């Protein structure tokens, strides 16, 4: 499961790149893609800030400081009134560009109690090995994912981004969303129908076998990063105080950080944190027990990708040719 999980993560991350590779693209598109990748790589090298509110407060502080510095030309002790002078914000155009959720490290996995799917007895009362068919089975199971924002990027800018948990053997994916501004928890669930066709089982002569199908459930937990680029400005007024005149102000978020921390487009990288916990069906197992010898053999029944249902909430499995214990 862990190897498949890591493989699934790699596949999920590479889907867009693979799509571009297998389709013929014009030289212009190739150049555009290379430029886009270069810009993305350059952004990832820049410093990342974890609280926009702090940057906004810094902008307001600098605004008041610069205002009183100008007033010192007329009132040498103007800076002594720093805590008395106020700022009244009147509007802003702050926004987060390209908010997205990225995996942060490898997830952990813990197998839970199996889900019973079905049971059948097959008896071969002849003197020769015989191929018998088990009955088909169907079961319903609810997959659930819970996502929590543990560290916001600040409450001043509202943004959300979706995240899909794709890594399980059934191919079922669960989608949830994260808030960049609120430490809230989202829980999404969906009922999945698992359809297991009859299996061809070769049974020894004069033998009864027990066939049990069950679904393994797994709890997958991990962490995520909430990333994006923030920009925008705030404007308002500084009310008059004593002899200090009223004044208007405006500052940009780009004014609150070192110029070396800015992306080429003047945006600032931000970084929040979150986690997720998904409980979902993983592998469909058929256990065949020879009741004469009590020997057991287990088989993983793969998903039938050729007969994939149009309904994403239905999983269809393949029919295998299985040798019961006692068959050489």
Curated annotation (Swiss-Prot):
Q: Which residues form the propeptide?
A: 33-45
Signal peptide feature range: 1-32
Check the record and name the Pfam families matching this protein.
ETX_MTX2
The keyword Heme appears for this protein = no
One GO BP on record is: symbiont-mediated pore formation in host plasma membrane
Keyword Ribonucleoprotein among record annotations: no
> Which family does the record claim for this protein?
To epsilon-toxin type D.
Q: What is the role of this chain?
A: Responsible for a rapidly fatal enterotoxemia.
Any idea what this protein is called?
Epsilon-toxin type B
Q: Which organism is it from?
A: Clostridium perfringens
């Amino acid at each position: 499961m862990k190897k498949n999980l890591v493989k699934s993560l790699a596949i999920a991350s590479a889907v867009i790149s693979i799509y571009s590779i297998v389709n013929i693209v014009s030289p212009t598109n190739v150049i555009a893609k290379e430029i886009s990748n270069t810009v993305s790589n350059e952004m990832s090298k820049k410093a990342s800030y974890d609280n926009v509110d702090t940057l906004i407060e810094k902008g307001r502080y600098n605004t008041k400081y610069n205002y009183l510095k100008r007033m010192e030309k007329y009132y040498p002790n103007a800076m002594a009134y720093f805590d008395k002078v106020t700022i009244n914000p009147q509007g802003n155009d702050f926004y987060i560009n390209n908010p997205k959720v990225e995996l942060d490290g490898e997830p952990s996995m813990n197998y839970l109690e199996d889900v019973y799917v079905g049971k059948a007895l097959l008896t071969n009362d002849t003197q020769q090995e015989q191929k018998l068919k088990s009955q088909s089975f169907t079961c319903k199971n609810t997959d659930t994912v819970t996502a929590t924002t543990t560290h916001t990027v600040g409450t001043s800018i509202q943004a959300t981004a979706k995240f899909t948990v794709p890594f399980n053997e059934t191919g079922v994916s669960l989608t949830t969303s994260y808030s960049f501004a609120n430490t809230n928890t989202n829980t999404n669930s969906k009922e999945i129908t698992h359809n297991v066709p009859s299996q061809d089982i070769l049974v020894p002569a004069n033998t009864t076998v027990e066939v049990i199908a069950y679904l393994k459930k797994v709890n997958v937990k991990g962490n995520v990063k909430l990333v994006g680029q923030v920009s925008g400005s705030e404007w308002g007024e500084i009310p008059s105080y004593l002899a200090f005149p009223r004044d208007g102000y405006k500052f940009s978020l780009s004014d609150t950080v070192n110029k070396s921390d800015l992306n080429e487009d003047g945006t600032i990288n931000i970084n929040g944190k979150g986690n997720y916990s998904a409980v979902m069906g993983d592998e469909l197992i058929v256990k065949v027990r020879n009741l004469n010898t009590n020997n057991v053999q287990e088989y993983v029944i793969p998903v039938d990708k050729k007969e994939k249902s149009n309904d994403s909430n239905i999983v269809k499995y393949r029919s295998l040719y299985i040798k019961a214990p006692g068959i050489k």
